């Protein structure tokens, strides 16, 4: 009988990432786990719709036995079965993040018995989660270098709090893993500013682009008007293409927050990234830990290890026979498999 892993959901950043990573790793390794204190560090602890959808999606994909899978639950037991490829569809039923549900189940499908397609409906532009364009333009090219081939398509936008978006990913089983080396980002090649609008006046986008252009020499400026029924919503993004990596930063517009303030938040975030020689931004770092651990080798540099990153590493080390090393030098932290 396989050993049961016991996790404390209050450890580290105390959010949903502990649960999502545990589900992914449990499906991959076949190790069951229990988790208590789910999202104990959040104002509204326990399973929200997005987390419950991730649990049910994971259970369906690997025929798991689950206890505690209900809204508000702070305890879960998950006994995985065999991962099977297929065509899967999951609905969150709110503006909860589609990409975070995908992030939970796709790693298991890298080891499935055949290709798969996963479609999730819910929120696509959520201030607390990476948008589909981040997955498509930043994460997936890096996964391809590791030997992981998946392709994400945004079928319909769904802004917070209304939702109604749809994201789909096609994924193939991995045949072999490669080592990812991201020590330096290299020189900047292009800066792209982009604004999405749905049911919001165009002058909002023009003011956001102007705020970005006042701080950066943009090589591209794009405004995309979406159908009104996909809104109301607004997201402003800035993509930094360097020689060795493309990073993408975004801010979701909010009611009663001016276009200038929204764009200024993005400017601050991008400047913080560019002020360090590190290759990887804070949010991308979280998402490289699992694929790098599965490959058994690799490294990247990040300006500062976030609590999210450290928590994710701790969970990965509970399930896999790997150890991460973090070394600070020359203004960056080098994260590697020891």
Swiss-Prot record:
What is the active site of this protein?
308
Return the EC number.
6.5.1.4
Single Gene Ontology MF annotation: ATP binding
Give the location in the cell.
Cytoplasm
Keywords noted in UniProt: ATP-binding, Cytoplasm, Ligase, Nucleotide-binding
PROSITE patterns in alphabetical order: RTC
Give the main location. Answer: cytoplasm
Q: Which InterPro entries match?
A: RNA3'-term_phos_cycl_insert (IPR013791), RNA3'_phos_cyclase_dom (IPR023797), RNA3'_phos_cyclase_dom_sf (IPR037136), RNA3'_term_phos_cyc (IPR000228), RNA3'_term_phos_cyc_type_1 (IPR017770), RNA3'_term_phos_cycl-like_CS (IPR020719), RNA3'P_cycl/enolpyr_Trfase_a/b (IPR013792), RPTC_insert (IPR036553)
Instruction: Enumerate the Gene Ontology biological process terms.
Output: RNA processing
Positions contributing to ATP binding: 103, 283-287
Q: Which GO terms describe its cellular component?
A: cytoplasm
Domain of life, source organism:
Bacteria
Reaction(s) catalysed by this chain, per the record, are:
a 3'-end 3'-phospho-ribonucleotide-RNA + ATP = a 3'-end 2',3'-cyclophospho-ribonucleotide-RNA + AMP + diphosphate
Q: What does this protein do?
A: Catalyzes the conversion of 3'-phosphate to a 2',3'-cyclic phosphodiester at the end of RNA. The mechanism of action of the enzyme occurs in 3 steps: (A) adenylation of the enzyme by ATP; (B) transfer of adenylate to an RNA-N3'P to produce RNA-N3'PP5'A; (C) and attack of the adjacent 2'-hydroxyl on the 3'-phosphorus in the diester linkage to produce the cyclic end product. The biological role of this enzyme is unknown but it is likely to function in some aspects of cellular RNA processing.
Q: Which family does it belong to?
A: Belongs to the RNA 3'-terminal cyclase family. Type 1 subfamily.
Q: List the protein's name.
A: RNA 3'-terminal phosphate cyclase
Record gene name:
rtcA
């Amino acid at each position: 009988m396989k050993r049961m892993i016991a996790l404390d959901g209050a450890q580290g950043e105390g959010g949903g990432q502990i649960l999502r990573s545990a589900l992914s790793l449990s499906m991959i390794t076949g190790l069951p786990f229990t988790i208590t204190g789910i999202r104990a560090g959040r104002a509204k602890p326990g399973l929200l719709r997005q987390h419950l959808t991730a649990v049910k999606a994971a259970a369906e994909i690997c025929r798991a036995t689950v206890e505690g899978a209900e809204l508000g639950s702070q305890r879960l037991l998950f006994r995985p079965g065999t991962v099977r490829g297929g065509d899967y569809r999951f609905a969150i039923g709110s503006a909860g993040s589609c990409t975070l549900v995908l992030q939970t189940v796709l790693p298991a499908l890298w080891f499935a018995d055949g290709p798969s397609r996963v479609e999730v409906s819910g929120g696509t532009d959520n201030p607390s989660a990476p948008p589909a364009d981040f997955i498509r333009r930043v994460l997936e090219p890096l996964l391809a270098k590791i030997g992981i081939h998946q392709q994400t398509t945004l079928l319909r936008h769904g802004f917070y709090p209304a939702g109604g978006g749809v994201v789909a990913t096609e994924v193939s089983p991995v045949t072999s893993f490669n080592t990812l080396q991201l020590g330096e980002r290299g020189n900047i090649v292009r800066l792209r500013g982009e604004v999405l609008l749905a049911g919001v006046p165009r002058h909002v986008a023009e003011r956001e682009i102007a705020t970005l252009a006042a701080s950066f020499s943009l090589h591209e400026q794009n405004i995309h008007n979406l159908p009104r029924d996909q809104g109301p919503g607004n997201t402003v993004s800035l993509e930094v293409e360097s020689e060795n990596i493309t990073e993408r930063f975004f801010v979701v517009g909010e009611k009663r927050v001016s276009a200038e303030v929204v764009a200024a938040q993005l400017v601050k975030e991008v400047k913080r990234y560019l002020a360090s020689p590190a290759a990887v931004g804070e949010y991308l770092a979280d998402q490289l830990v699992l694929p790098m651990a599965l490959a058994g080798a690799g490294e990247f540099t990040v300006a500062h290890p976030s609590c999210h990153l450290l928590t994710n590493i701790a969970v990965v080390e509970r399930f896999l026979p790997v150890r991460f090393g973090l070394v600070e030098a020359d203004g960056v932290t080098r994260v590697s498999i020891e």
